[in-house]
Structure formats: C-alpha cells, structure tokens
C-alpha cells in the first residue's frame, strides 16, 4: 500500500480528450457501484466541459479507498470494482488483434459496463430505466464500436481466460441498481 498519493487536477488539462474520457470511465464505474447521488452529479458533469474535477476526484478516490480498505484481499465486496471489466478486458484484447483500431482501457470498460448493466437488467437485478440512463450517458461520451458476429465467439474465448473466473464459468459483476 502506498504511504501517500498526490493528485493534482490541473494535469487533466494536459491530457488528450480520448485519455480524459478513458479515465472518466472509472469515475462512472465508481458512481454506478457505490453512490446514486454521485451518479446524478456525474450525469451533469460532462468531462469535456468545465467540470469541477476536484470534488469528482475526491469522491472517486474515497469510494475506491473505502472498498479496498473493507476488503484488502479481494475475497468479497471488493469484487464490485470489477464491474465492466470482465467484458471490458475481452473487448480491449480483441481491439488489439488483427489490424483493428485499439481501444483504451476506459473505452473498453465503458462498453463492458453497458453489457454488464444489460446482464444485470436481464437477471432482474436492475430496472430498465437505470439501464437506459447508463446506456445513454456512456454512448453519448464514447465512440460507437461495431463488432461482427464472428467476434462474439472470440470475445467469449477471451472472457474464459479472465483471472476472476472459477470452475470454468465466466464471472461477471452484476449490479442490483445504480449505487
């Protein structure tokens, strides 16, 4: 564990738009997994506008820190931090294959969050309005990607290799709702 962490939001102004959005995917994830009121703030804080980054960063750091401190060995609740990552890692890996345009980690996780939100709704854990809200925000921020039918099989192969899986089944992090 680090002794301290230094964060200066001023450096965000030096990032290309694509990298800023990549990092913002983790902010979205923190709101979705932990705090509905934070989600409402995120809905009104477009990352390319004049967002006040300091409270956003403080809230995301506090959420992640509280989860990690509550479950330092990732035996239980900390797994919620994997939301969007099972599918996201597979999408990111696929984007690096065969001359495709590589996706950033955040772009891939954003796709994964939409997919895992859809799975959450299908399992009757999340309502349709929340799924729609998540989908609308993410698709408004991130470039649309189209996957071919043949990619589905490759994505499943890649998901099967995920370190979080147990007993040859793919593990997803599903949400009961926003926050």
Stretches with model-predicted labels:
Residues 1-44:
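A glycine/threonine-rich phosphate-anchoring loop and its flanking beta-alpha core
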Residues 24-28, 56-67, 81, 113, ...:
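Short alpha-helical scaffolding segments that buttress acidic/His motifs in well-ordered protein cores
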Residues 25-27, 125-179:
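C-terminal charged capping/lid subdomain of soluble metabolic enzymes
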Residues 45-99:
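Oxyanion-binding "anion nests"
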Residues 93, 114-122:
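Short glycine/serine- and small hydrophobic-enriched flexible loop segments
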Residues 107-115:
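Small-residue-rich helix-loop
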């Amino acid at each position: 564990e680090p002794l301290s962490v230094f964060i200066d939001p001023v450096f965000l102004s030096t990032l290309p738009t694509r990298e800023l959005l990549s990092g913002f995917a983790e902010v979205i994830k923190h709101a979705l997994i932990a705090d509905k009121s934070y989600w409402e703030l995120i809905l009104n804080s477009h990352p390319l506008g004049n967002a006040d980054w300091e409270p956003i960063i403080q809230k995301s750091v506090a959420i992640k820190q509280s989860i990690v401190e509550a479950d330092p060995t990732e035996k239980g609740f900390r797994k919620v931090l994997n939301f969007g990552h099972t599918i996201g890692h597979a999408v990111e890996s696929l984007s690096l294959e065969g001359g495709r345009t590589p996706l950033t980690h955040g772009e891939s996780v954003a796709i994964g969050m939409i997919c895992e939100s859809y799975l959450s709704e299908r399992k009757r854990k999340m309502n349709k309005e929340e799924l729609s809200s998540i989908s609308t925000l993410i698709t408004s921020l991130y470039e649309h990607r189209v996957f071919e039918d043949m990619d589905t099989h490759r994505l499943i192969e890649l998901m099967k290799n995920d370190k979080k899986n147990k007993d040859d089944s793919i593990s997803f992090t599903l949400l009961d709702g926003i926050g």
